[in-house]
Amino acid sequence: MQLLQLLISGIAQGCIYGLIALGFVLIYKATETVSFAQGELMMLGAFCGLAAMTMLGFPYWLSVLATIAAMALFGVLLERIVIRPILGQPAFSIVMLTIGIGYVVRGLITMIPAIGTETHTLPVPYKDQIWNWAGLVLNVEQMVVIAATAVLCALLYLLFRYSKLGIAMQAASQNQLAAYYMGIPVNRLNGIAWGLAAAVAAIAGLLLAPITFVHANMGFIGLKAFPAAVVGGFGSLPGAIVGGLIIGTVESLSGFYLPNGFKDTAAYVVVLVMLVIKPNGLFGEKLRKKV
């Protein structure tokens, strides 16, 4: 029974990692660059939700929808104003820019008096609720994370499988030049990809905040989400979720069964093992370029 409790806890944490990793993969597939600002976008989403609930007095569900919409718009504007002008530059330059964006977002949050430097509780309706089922003590906050992740994955599957927008995004991710000559608005799709990644990061922040707290440093969890994207296969959306679940589960089990300190390094040990066994990740494809 203890093992099952640990697995549920690990799956819930892994869902958070997986959602942030989805943002990594969405942006990578759209622009072939890596955004290390995903953790800070998650943190910003949590603060937006907190502001909507406590300052604006919005009800919970309206706060969630408003936060997701606001972060999606922020992601689109970020791509248009900051990222798009330097596309075509060396990938290292874009990566460093995203790291800088993360620092700027965190710095701006900490500058807000009585908010940015404090730890806050997100007032959700299911805070601290417990379900007792078949001898298991289930944390409702964790179950909401798992359920919401499952629903979001289903919605993303429908988007990319059946909608014209999703199919166009897949085509652009395979070959942007060919997609451009076929009349697909590649630049617009890049902006949508950034907006979608920011919205998913906001959802992750709103799901994580009730389990932990809302604070300026919660964005550092993105450092655990990056290994999830690597394990799943950088470029695979299902792989991001599976990688997150693996990282979360290993982290939960190692934190209980292994000595102190192993929990924080478990994610990177898994990455090292994966790079040795399967360098392209579980769902990654081996790409060959003819010269």
Tell me what each language-model feature is.
Residues 8, 30-77, 81:
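Membrane-embedded helix boundary and interhelical linker motif in transport proteins
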Residues 19, 24, 71-73, 224-247, ...:
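Hydrophobic alpha-helical transmembrane segments of polytopic membrane proteins
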Residues 85-162, 189, 253, 258-260, ...:
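Transmembrane helix-bundle core of multi-pass membrane transporters
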Residues 15, 26-46, 60, 88-93, ...:
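Short, non-helical or kinked segments that cap or interrupt transmembrane helices
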Residues 1-20, 48, 58-63, 89-93, ...:
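Membrane-interfacial amphipathic/re-entrant helices at transmembrane-helix boundaries
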Residues 1-16, 159-160, 164, 190-229, ...:
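Inter-helical junctions in multi-pass inner-membrane proteins, predominant
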